């Protein structure tokens, strides 16, 4: 079976992420979306929420599974019997960082390959950071994320006392 793992924080999952997941689902027998716990990044949404949102967003894709993880990515690949890591590149600036990660992963597990995909043009400017900031300030993110993500962000920031919307 040809398996690819698409790791990320997905805080939140965006239309750009979905674009890559959907395209990968046509190239591979199985796509594992691996949601990193990433405590150092202090995610806005909990790991459980991020996993649930991706499950909902990708419900139409039969060969996609979603899992949370807090181990080394190469350990997760071994658990999933996968040898390929999918990463998205929006701009040249992403490449340098991604190349560094790819080389580190290969040093950890020499049989692991990294596959880089670029998003469709209409998704090339979308980032989770931008989506979070727009949502935190009360802006409309409905063209950037799935409706379930809009709802989750609205609920989160309605309860967040540091959000300008609640002040």
UniProtKB/Swiss-Prot annotation:
Domain of life according to the entry: Bacteria
Gene Ontology CC, one term: cytoplasm
Gene Ontology biological process terms, A to Z: coenzyme A biosynthetic process
Subcellular compartments: Cytoplasm
Its job: Reversibly transfers an adenylyl group from ATP to 4'-phosphopantetheine, yielding dephospho-CoA (dPCoA) and pyrophosphate.
Oligomer and partners: Homohexamer.
Entry's family note: Belongs to the bacterial CoaD family.
Name by which UniProt lists this protein: Phosphopantetheine adenylyltransferase
């Amino acid at each position: 079976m040809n398996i690819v793992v698409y790791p990320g924080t997905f805080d939140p999952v965006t239309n750009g992420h979905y674009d890559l997941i959907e395209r990968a689902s046509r190239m591979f027998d199985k796509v594992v979306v691996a949601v990193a716990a990433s405590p150092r990044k202090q995610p806005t949404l909990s790991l459980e929420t991020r996993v649930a949102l991706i499950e909902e967003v990708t419900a139409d894709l039969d060969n996609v599974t979603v899992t949370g993880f807090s181990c080394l990515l190469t350990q997760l690949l071994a658990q999933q019997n996968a040898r390929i890591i999918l990463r998205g590149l929006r701009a040249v600036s992403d490449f340098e960082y991604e190349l560094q990660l790819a080389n580190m992963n290969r040093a950890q597990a020499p049989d692991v390959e990294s596959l880089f995909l670029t998003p469709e043009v209409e998704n090339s400017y979308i980032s989770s950071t931008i989506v979070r900031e727009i949502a935190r300030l009360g802006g409309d993110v409905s063209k950037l994320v799935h409706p379930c993500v809009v709802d989750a962000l609205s609920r989160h920031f309605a309860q967040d006392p540091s959000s300008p919307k609640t002040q």
